[in-house]
Amino acid sequence: MLFNFYNKTSAACKSLPAKALSNVRYFQTSPISRKMPLPPVLESRRPKESPEFDYSTLSNYKSFKVKHSQLDVSVDFKKKTISGSVSYEIEKVKKDENTIKLDTSYLKISKVKVDDEDDVKFKLLERKHPLGAQLIVSPSSLPEIFHLCLQFSTTADCTALQWLDEHQTSGKPYVFSQLEAIHARSLFTCFDTPSVKSTYLANIKSELPVVFSGIQTGYDDSTKVYSFKQEVPIPAYLIGIASGDLASADIGPRSKVYVEPYRLKDAQWEFDGDVEKFITTAEDIIFKYEWGTYDILVNPNSYPYGGMESPNMTFATPTLIAHDKSNIDVIAHELAHSWSGNLVTNCSWDHFWLNEGWTVYLERRITGAIHGEATRHFSSLIGWNDLEGSISAMQNPERFSCLVQNLKDGTDPDNAFSTVPYEKGSNLLFYLENLLGGKEVFDPFIKHYFTKFARQSLDTWQFLDALFEFFHDKREILESVDWQTWLFTPGMPPKPKLITDLADDVYALANKWIASAQKFTEREQFEKEFSIKDISEFSSNQIVLLLDTLVQGGMPEKDTFKWSNYPEASEIFTDIYEDKISKSQNAEVIFRNYRLQVKSHITSSYPELAEWLGTVGRMKFVRPGYRLLNEVDRELAIKTFHRFRDSYHPICKSLVKQDLGI
């Protein structure tokens, strides 16, 4: 059957369908006309060309325009492979270029075809970590516009996919992809850079339902082939494929949720009604949603991220299902990517903040518009705490806590991944909003920016040029910004002025507990002073801030206070607030409760945290969870990791190994 399928799909090597090509829309970056140069600190660092070259790809992508792409693949759960062909319609930019250099990583390449030339010569160079193995295609001739087709198969070393057996799911095998940042090259041969965007068609054969980063156009029950289209040009890292025992339900007029059947009712309840509200609010802030549908795939427990912004089909962690809608702001984040990241994209991972900083900023604008400005500021407070924790835990903060990164030496972008581009980036935009005159002044720039760079990839200097160009009448204000600190200096950024209405009661309660821990010696004293009523009206996010503030020693932070000196007080805290904290089903609360207990050296919590780490795959919890265990019981941390390592995504597994030094 697989051989017959290959015969069927290899027809894509002959030519791409005329119908598909009629939908092709290619947008090339337009040069920006600058009336005046930027301040010297920015001009001195300006790259020779914009968008800046992407050093995280081995391809010669600057020589070509990819106008359309097509995937024709088969999912084989027994062999744990995805195989088939990828076809490109390409236009030469450099007329004298006669070889095509592509990205691969742990792929088998069986055949290459250019137009009517079968069995084109190709050479797969030796793999060099982390960028993979360069594929050099050498056709006898290369016309100005040509079709390239490559037949391939993934291997057991593939870093783009996680295969789950029946015992890791509700009973049937499952596979999902995670391609950001440079793992698309491990799924299919490509120009694996966010600088290259194209439209896509996909035909995917699988014995189980399939979802893809596009709109489904058909399903052939006789061949088990699912067909999709993506008419908005996207880079390879945004491709998303998943297949498994999936059911779906409506959660809005243009949205569905896909999930394993046993979770369908809970997932539908969690998201129903809120997604459309997010979409319409985002449309008011930016402009009309361009992708048609917005669906959500809730993956099994091992999914490593909170979400991945695959167009039309957000991939999400099951930790969002908190049974109280308290974590659905993650969906506001992934939805915001429909504009920042997916429509307007960083040209390389050095400028990742253009994706994530804008997205966090827009996410909080969306939730602030729905729930009030105080909610927006409160989310920023929690984000600030996350940023402090992320930077303090970094092994190389001097390098990786700068907003604009430097990965030109071939460093793995995954190693640079942190909350810095998210929180430092969003804080910069929030700072600019207030500096320039507030939302009323800044909002027209939002629409201008996303209109100007729609369907393009850009670098930080293009953002800055657009900013200075738009606010030409406020140049003196923009020149007063400490750009060196914001963009190029490691460490925390300047702290924003935030509305603390929702935080003040939290800070007061945290400080009261810390004072009492140092004063009280008997449980009865605590029980007289505190009760569950203290937090009965707190939202989950307020409880998160309470636990964060307790761990950091109060507000303002007291470095001299250590919970390890007051373990009894910590245990009493957990007992008094059991119904809202210990019994919570919100992973954000669960993790922070374990962190408080571990920091308090409550040894009974160590094996409990270890067991919990076997039930989640989200790196936001897994990585700091293992670091916590490693601080207090290295043997247990390593033993736990070896016990659960096969349940983690390859990216997660690799990074935890680094964290533990094994």
Curated annotation (Swiss-Prot):
SMART domains: Leuk-A4-hydro_C (SM01263). One of its GO terms (biological process) is peptide catabolic process. InterPro entries: Aminopeptidase_N-like_N, Aminopeptidase_N-like_N_sf, ARM-type_fold, LTA4H, LTA4H_cat, M1_LTA-4_hydro/amino_C_sf, M1_LTA4H, Peptidase_M1. It holds the Pfam family Leuk-A4-hydro_C. Its EC number is 3.4.11.-, 3.3.2.10. PANTHER family: LEUKOTRIENE A-4 HYDROLASE (PTHR45726:SF3). Belongs to the peptidase M1 family. This is Leucine aminopeptidase 2.
